[in-house]
Curated annotation (Swiss-Prot):
It comes from Gibberella moniliformis (strain M3125 / FGSC 7600) (Maize ear and stalk rot fungus). GO terms for molecular function: acyltransferase activity. This is Acyl-CoA transferase FVEG_12629. Its EC number is 2.8.3.-. Pfam families: CoA_transf_3. It is an enzyme of class 2 (transferase). Disruption phenotype: Does not affect tolerance to 2-benzoxazolinone (BOA). Fusarium verticillioides possesses 2 unlinked loci, FDB1 and FDB2, necessary for detoxification of antimicrobial compounds produced by maize, including 2-benzoxazolinone (BOA). The FDB2 cluster arose as a duplication of the FDB1 cluster with rearrangement and expansion by incorporating additional genes. InterPro entries: CoA-trans_III_biosynth/detox, CoA-Trfase_fam_III, CoA-Trfase_III_dom_1_sf. Induction: Expression is induced in response to 2-benzoxasolinone (BOA) exposure. Belongs to the CoA-transferase III family. Acyl-CoA transferase; part of the Fusarium detoxification of benzoxazolinone cluster 2 (FDB2) involved in the degradation of benzoxazolinones produced by the host plant. Maize, wheat, and rye produce the 2 benzoxazinone phytoanticipins 2,4-dihy-droxy-7-methoxy-1,4-benzoxazin-3-one (DIMBOA) and 2,4-dihydroxy-1,4-benzoxazin-3-one (DIBOA) that, due to their inherent instability once released, spontaneously degrade to the more stable corresponding benzoxazolinones, 6-methoxy-2-benzoxazolinone (MBOA) and 2-benzoxazolinone (BOA), respectively. Keywords: Acyltransferase, Transferase.
């Protein structure tokens, strides 16, 4: 059993283990912490002890943050709620769940773990079968590339995470950098130097205010303690990580029974509308699809999105349609899907869909009319309330805000205050499984108690959970052992997330069998991307294949299908 020591090794507010606990045992410890803190989560020891965490003792993700353990635990919690639903459906009385912690370690790299007919790595998105949804990022412009990085401000020891989002030129214009400079700046290093020169003219609060005023994304790099002392940090701290509640004015709706189907997976027959972009929401939808839900993902072909998601398991098991909510005909089509849906998963800025008639209140009204509850879950960067709740945000921004980037910088020995990205899209992918867990709790409770449910999951809340004083951080000597085993590269504040995670995969491939283990993958021979598509499979495994998570159809591009209603079940 590990004990804690508040020695602030990685900055203010950090708590470090006094001794190392093997990863499977650490997962068991954290599972019980999360179970005790989560309202409505089972305290049944048969279910908690039924989780079999197994795999390597040493984590495979670089750095002191226990990302791999927390991600494995969130998958285990999904598995537990899935079993509770299976019990309600009368499918099984089994309590056993298998979580391979090595597989959970690969999970944050899902979008990069794609093999199309032998093509892997960054070459995948260059294939003609993969549609391009963000041509600016594919433009090879160094300025666009460096618009997303961490820069030092005029305040000594205070850094800022700039983020180009899906329109880097808006962010660059804020700094007085226009497209006219694009032809002059021909290297990534030159671009970083120019942007650093401009950012250093501002104090941290000044550039934060500019970004907020323009509706753009970015954050000061806070230490964990500094973030907790902000008003937004305090707002998030008031909510549990798995954050959902029954809506009181819908409580009279009767419990919603599950359909009796040949498909024995927990969510078979559950209808999900996925209104998301980029990674976290897509990961949530994919998890629900693997558990049997019918997921219809709605994109607009007029909006940019994350190209690498398409051939990965982020898009497996779904139908993807193209709707423009400014078009009255498409607006009507989405309303028809809302009328049928059991679950609304939305990952746009808070209030954005409500202004178009597709917010929580509209969904609750439709549920009341049909006499069957709905589960509506928002996924965003900053959480359900507080002065930043409606701001746009990305994984890197949440990492900077909550203190994850600060901790990584300290683990590398950089000066106090300098931020460095975590190695993978960890908060994105893990918030995805957190979102799926939140939805599943609502589905379970709708079946038990009736009513409708509203939930919320956020990137920053996930990061705060990994930096919690009870979860703790790894000691420096453990971090060094991880680095020595895989010979990970070091990186600095200028790194871009895509080449960073490919470098992590390269280290895994050279120094271990981790990414070569076929049991972590599934193959599709009927994919539009190629004749043999290999992607990362679901992490949760049950004792019997008939109700274990799986995808019945391969990943597809965005907007791939014609408009369709949910199947009648």
């Amino acid at each position: 059993m590990t004990t804690k020591t508040s020695n602030e090794t990685y900055g203010a507010g950090t708590v470090v283990d006094s001794e190392f606990s093997p990863l499977p045992a650490e997962c068991e410890r954290i599972l019980r912490i999360f179970a005790a803190r989560t309202p409505g989560f089972t305290k049944d020891e048969a279910l908690l002890s039924g989780v079999n965490f197994h795999g390597d003792d040493l984590p495979c993700i670089p750095g002191p943050i226990k990302s791999q353990a927390v991600t494995a635990v969130l998958h285990a919690m999904v598995g537990i709620v899935g079993l509770e639903i299976l019990h309600l459906r009368g499918v099984t009385t089994d309590n056993q769940i298998d979580i391979d912690v090595n597989h959970a370690g690969l999970y944050p790299a899902t979008a990069a773990l794609v093999d199309i007919d032998g093509v892997t790595g960054p070459e995948v998105i260059k294939l003609p079968t993969v549609p391009q949804w963000d041509k600016d990022r594919a433009s090879n412009s160094p300025l666009v590339y460096r618009a997303t990085a961490i820069y030092e401000t005029a305040d000594s020891g205070v850094w800022f995470q700039l983020h180009g989002s899906l329109d880097s030129w808006k962010v660059l214009a804020l700094l007085g950098i226009g497209k006219d400079l694009d032809s002059e700046i021909r290297t990534n290093d030159a671009a970083y130097e120019l942007i650093q020169e401009r950012v250093r003219k501002y104090r941290a609060r000044e550039i934060e205010q500019l970004v907020v005023e323009k509706g753009l994304s970015g954050s000061i790099v806070y230490s964990p303690e500094e973030w907790r002392q902000t008003e937004m940090g305090r707002s998030l701290s008031r909510h549990p990580l798995v954050n959902y509640k029954q809506k009181s004015h819908c409580a009279t709706l009767a419990p919603a029974s599950f359909p009796v189907l040949e498909d024995k997976r927990p969510l078979a027959g559950i209808k999900v509308v996925e209104l998301t972009r980029i990674i976290a929401g897509a990961a949530a939808g994919a998890a629900l699809a693997s558990l049997g839900a019918e997921v219809i993902r709605v994109n607009s072909s007029k909006l940019k999105d994350y190209t690498p998601a398409q051939p990965s398991s982020l898009m497996a098991g779904k139908k993807t349609i193209d709707l423009d909510l400014e078009d009255p005909a498409d607006h009507k089509k989405l309303m028809q899907l809302f009328e049928q849906a059991d679950v609304i998963l939305q990952g746009y800025r808070l209030g954005s869909l409500a202004r178009r008639g597709f917010g929580l209140e509209a969904a609750l009204e439709l549920a009341n009319k049909r006499g069957r509850g709905v589960v509506y879950v928002d996924e965003n960067c900053y959480g359900p309330d507080g002065y930043y709740a409606e701001r746009p945000g990305w994984q890197q921004v949440a990492d900077a805000a909550a203190g994850s980037s600060y901790v990584m910088g300290q683990s590398f020995g950089f000066p106090k205050g300098q931020g460095v990205l975590p190695s993978l899209p960890i908060s994105d992918m893990s918030t995805g499984i957190l979102t799926a867990l939140t939805i599943m709790c609502g589905i379970r409770d709708r079946a038990k108690f009736g009513g409708s449910y509203h939930g919320h999951a956020s990137l920053t809340a996930y990061n705060m959970a990994t930096l919690d004083s009870e979860v703790r951080l790894y000691q420096r000597e453990v971090v060094q052992k991880i680095s020595d085993k895989y010979e990970f590269p070091t990186w600095s504040s200028d790194v871009h997330v895509a080449p960073l995670y490919y470098s992590i995969l390269d280290a895994w491939g050279k120094k271990s069998e981790l990414i070569k283990d076929e049991k972590h993958y599934i193959h599709f021979s009927d994919s539009v991307f190629g004749s043999d598509l290999r992607v990362l499979g679901p992490v949760v495994r049950y004792d019997k294949e008939e109700y274990s998570p799986k995808w019945n159809s391969p990943p597809v591009p965005f907007c791939h299908h014609e408009f369709t209603m949910f199947s009648n079940q």
